[in-house]
Regions:
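Conserved catalytic core of nucleic-acid polymerases
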Residues: 47-53, 107, 219-220, 224-227, ...
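Conserved catalytic alpha/beta cores of large enzymes that bind or transform nucleotide phosphates
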Residues: 253-277, 288-321
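Conserved beta-strand -> loop -> alpha-helix junction used to position metal-binding or nucleic-acid-contacting
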Residues: 1-3, 9-12, 293-297
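Conserved, non-catalytic sequence blocks in retroelement Pol enzymes and Pol-derived host proteins
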Residues: 3, 145, 267, 289-291, ...
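Hydrophobic, well-ordered secondary-structure elements that form the walls
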Residues: 147, 230, 268, 301, ...
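Conserved "right-hand" nucleotidyltransferase catalytic core of DNA-directed polymerases
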Residues: 5, 9, 13, 29-250, ...
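C-terminal structured "cap/appendage" subdomains that terminate the fold
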Residues: 426-476
Length: 476
């Protein structure tokens, strides 16, 4: 009902839906965790703590009572709001069953080879130390590379490199500034590499090692109410953001292994958001392109650049791919020019050609923006609402952001709804058939199944059937 919030404290529920003011969790227990509370709760309910014979609850017990009461009492009002907003079906058919799917996935966890993770960390440490020495030699000074202030003084003060932007706290050493310098100054590229490796080590080599539990598995928390578009997110740790763009990043995936007797089997929705765009826009040319072409990016390049399919170059395909995915996110000519390192005029020409090729897509995206302005929100195919308050802003940049949100949210949100439906169907089928195999990870459009080897063919069938029937799209 309010997807722009990422926390839903009981005192907020009481205020917003029950017209009540109650003490907050912070008021009652401060910074204590619920683990601390449970350990303190007195189990002797027969003990009388006051003269009138009634029990006196401690602050932890009061907090739990308020949580239970506000959840129970606000149910009727929240259900009414779901009906009023047309999201009752979404809530009861998708989100509520998903609680069980996510619980089963969190309970299963994913196995990690601790020794390989430690070896990976040692490898990173060695490379980081080597880079440190090379950076000291390249700059002619020993300093704290992790200090933006010291790094800025060395690069732009001492070495007098170009593009120095002085701020109140010193020179900016943001990635976009350093990336401009890297092609001409090898030491700057080493600094960028150093940053990547130190992040890999702290976040993954060290971070993952700290959360491996006694069963040898990592049990992440999967959240269904954090993102505004309805996407599932992962925290403690984030297993949806394992890097894949650099070789050392990809190596981290090798520490995740199936249990003995099991194998990993994954299935994803290929280009799900583009397929959703084709379906929701109803653009017949784009729908036909998906039905006929194995490579939608080559076909788009052929149509946008008006050349035969067999003559499409790798560069033209890459540019068409950037346009295809950029359109989904409401990309501007400036944004596309930055992505492809071309002029803004060329980028605008690419976008215009795309819309000339798929005119119903342009009409659909424009319609989404107009609906967002009129109603204050946009909706997914399944009725999920995404408020877009930025569309009414007096600030041009805010309004432009709002337009991109209005164009993208129904597409990304619909894709998120589809993968949730697929998760529910797959999880339910695996359990109904009494299989040992289980979902261990969901990464946006992909499901990873820890599959008992003897069930491999069965699980392949389950994934294929249940994911295909999650939604009825004009392009499958």
């Amino acid at each position: 009902l309010n997807p722009l919030k990422d926390t839903y404290d009981y005192d907020d529920l009481a205020r917003d839906y029950l017209d009540m003011t109650v003490p907050s969790k912070g008021d009652l227990i401060g910074k204590q965790s619920f683990g601390d509370i449970f350990s303190e709760i007195t189990m002797d309910l027969g003990q009388e703590a006051s003269e009138n014979g009634k029990e006196e609850l401690n602050s932890g017990e009061q907090c739990l009572c308020y949580m239970a009461y506000t959840a129970w009492k606000s149910r009727e009002r929240l259900t009414e709001k779901l009906k009023e907003t047309g999201m009752e079906e979404l809530f009861f058919s998708i989100e509520m069953p998903l609680i069980y799917s996510l619980f089963h996935m969190e309970q299963a966890g994913i196995c990690v080879k601790r020794e390989e993770l430690q070896a990976y960390g040692e490898r990173l440490r060695g490379q980081i130390e080597t880079l440190e020495q090379e950076i000291y030699q390249g700059t002619g000074e020993v300093f704290n590379i992790n200090s933006p202030k010291q790094l800025g003084e060395i690069l732009f003060g001492k070495m007098e490199l170009p593009y120095g932007k002085k701020t109140k706290t010193g020179y900016s050493t943001a990635a976009d500034v350093l990336e401009k310098l890297a092609p001409e100054y090898p030491v700057v590229q080493k600094i960028l590499d150093y940053r990547q490796l130190t992040k890999l080590k702290s976040t993954y080599a060290d971070g993952l090692g700290a959360v491996i539990e006694a069963d040898g598995r990592i049990h992440s928390t999967f959240n269904q109410t954090i993102t505004a578009t309805g996407r599932i997110s992962s925290t403690e740790p984030n297993l949806q953001n394992i890097p894949v763009r650099m070789e050392l990043g990809r190596l981290i995936r090798k520490v995740f292994v199936p249990e003995p007797g099991f194998v990993f089997l994954d299935a994803d929705y290929s280009q799900i958001e583009l397929r959703v765009l084709a379906h929701m826009s109803g653009d017949e040319k784009l729908i036909q392109a998906y039905r006929e072409a194995e490579d939608i990016h080559r076909l788009t390049a052929s149509q946008v650049f008006h050349i035969p399919l067999e003559e499409v170059t790798p560069l033209q395909r890459r540019n068409a791919k950037a346009v295809n995915f950029g359109i989904v996110y409401g990309i501007s000519a400036f944004g596309l020019s930055e992505d492809l390192s071309i002029t803004r005029k060329e980028a605008l020409e690419y976008i215009n050609r795309y819309f000339e090729t798929y005119p119903e897509v342009k009409k659909f995206l424009d319609r989404l923006v107009e609906e967002g302005k009129e109603h204050g929100y946009v909706t997914t195919m399944f009725g999920r609402r995404r408020p877009v308050p930025e569309l009414s802003s007096k600030n041009f940049m805010q309004r432009s952001f709002g337009e991109r949100v209005a164009m993208n949210s129904p597409i990304q949100g619909t894709a998120a709804d589809i993968i949730k439906i697929a998760m529910n169907r797959v999880d339910r089928r695996l359990r109904r058939e009494g299989l040992k195999s289980r979902i261990v990870l969901q990464v946006h459009d992909e499901l990873l199944i820890e599959t008992w080897k003897e069930e491999l063919d069965t699980v392949r069938t389950v994934l294929s059937e249940e994911m295909k029937h999650a939604a009825d799209l004009k392009v499958s």
